[in-house]
Swiss-Prot record:
This is Nucleotide-binding protein P9515_05441. GO terms for molecular function: nucleotide binding. The keyword Nucleotide-binding applies. Belongs to the YajQ family. Coiled coil: none annotated.
Length: 165
């Protein structure tokens, strides 16, 4: 049994689910009594969500709705990185939410080191924004997946195990 088993570790999210969640947020903003007439604008660009509204209270309500809809769509809340609130013209406030996607080299190296320190019989290689974890034992790979769940909390990034072979 010289066959190696492997899986890939990625930090990703389903963009279409995010688009659907934000569409639901826009619909709820237009229908909720406390948010009607607040001139709230919600924009999604490649790696950012921009929220512009008339008060911080409304902004906090919109952020809560975004979180609720993201959870219902099975999106991790760790993909959202909240920037500071800015005052913009016309007595409005704006917040930028950056979307985290991909593993940078520094975090990939730390995760790789943690996995190798805990489980001696695995090989970990970094391929761009993906980690490939290989072992001759499926049990070691399952232990690595369990360890990834703990590392997700440590590094505050969403991690998924894909292509389990």
């Amino acid at each position: 049994m010289a066959e190696n088993f492997s899986f890939d570790v990625v930090s990703d999210f389903d963009r279409q689910e995010l688009v659907n969640a934000l569409d639901q947020v826009k619909r709820e903003i237009s229908q909720r009594y406390d948010l009607k007439g607040t001139e709230t604008i919600l924009e999604l660009e490649k790696e950012n969500i921009f929220i512009t509204t008339n008060s911080e209270l409304t902004l906090n309500s919109v952020i809560d709705i975004i979180r609720q809809k993201a959870i219902k769509r099975k999106l991790s809340l760790k993909i959202f990185e909240y920037k500071s609130i800015e005052a913009v013209s016309g007595n409005k406030v704006k917040q930028t939410i950056t979307l985290k996607k991909g593993l940078n080299q520094e975090i990939a190296k730390k995760i790789s080191k943690n996995l190798r320190d805990e489980i001696k019989k695995i090989n970990v290689s970094i391929n761009g924004e993906t980690l490939r974890v290989m072992s001759k034992s499926k049990n070691d790979l399952q232990l690595a997946i369990k360890l990834l769940e703990n590392l997700e909390e440590t590094y505050k990034i969403p991690l998924q195990a894909n292509n389990y072979r």
